[in-house]
Design a protein with these regions (language model features):
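ATP/NTP-dependent adenylation/nucleotidyl-transfer catalytic domains that generate, transfer
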Residues: 20, 28, 98-178
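ATP-dependent adenylation/nucleotidyltransferase module used to activate substrates
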Residues: 1-106, 120-134
Length: 178
């Protein structure tokens, strides 16, 4: 998904194209402009504090729409252990416990595309190590809107816990599944 974040997304889209080409995997990219008529940058003017919420909703719609366009029967995302643990903790902090059990793969027309998360039990560190060992590592910029994100603080908190108490993130994910 190309959200249209100037100075950021161009580089990550290019990197994804290179990696998928190298791996022999089909790569499809769809933009917010194509889907919604404008870029995320334009949608956010004056509402930058809401960036992650707005982007998250639109990205999910875009992913489901893209999956339908190419006739996909599953939607694989790159969510890793760190992402999953952060989401669990953020939902707890927000008091949104219903999200801990909700499955969100339905678009506005009600057409379900099952999501799979093959990397959900693999840490960011392990993924980075794999990419480095296989000479596929690319240093990518961080989204400029993360400075407004609760996730940034939760990531820092969880990283500290994981360092001092190895296995924290995995146990957090396992607790959600119980």
């Amino acid at each position: 998904i190309d959200e249209g974040i100037a100075g950021y997304r161009e580089e990550t889209v290019h990197s994804a194209e290179q990696l998928t080409r190298r791996l022999g995997i089909e790569h499809h990219c769809i933009s917010f402009t194509e889907l919604f008529g404008d870029s995320l940058d334009t949608f956010l003017k004056g509402r930058e504090q809401q960036a992650c919420s707005i982007c998250g909703i639109l990205r999910k719609k875009g992913l489901v729409s893209g999956a339908h366009r190419i006739g996909a029967t599953k939607l694989a995302t790159g969510h890793n252990l760190d992402d999953e643990a952060q989401s669990v903790l953020m939902n707890v902090f927000r008091g949104d416990l219903s999200r801990l059990i909700r499955n969100s793969g339905v678009d506005s027309s009600g057409k379900f595309v099952p999501r799979i998360k093959p990397l959900s039990l693999v840490s960011e560190k392990e993924i980075a190590q794999y990419l480095i060992l296989n000479e596929a590592w690319t240093e990518l910029p961080e989204c400029p809107y993360t400075r407004y994100a609760m996730r940034r603080e939760v990531r820092s908190l969880l990283s500290g816990f994981e360092y001092r108490h190895p296995g924290t993130m995995l146990r957090l994910i396992e607790s959600r599944q119980k």
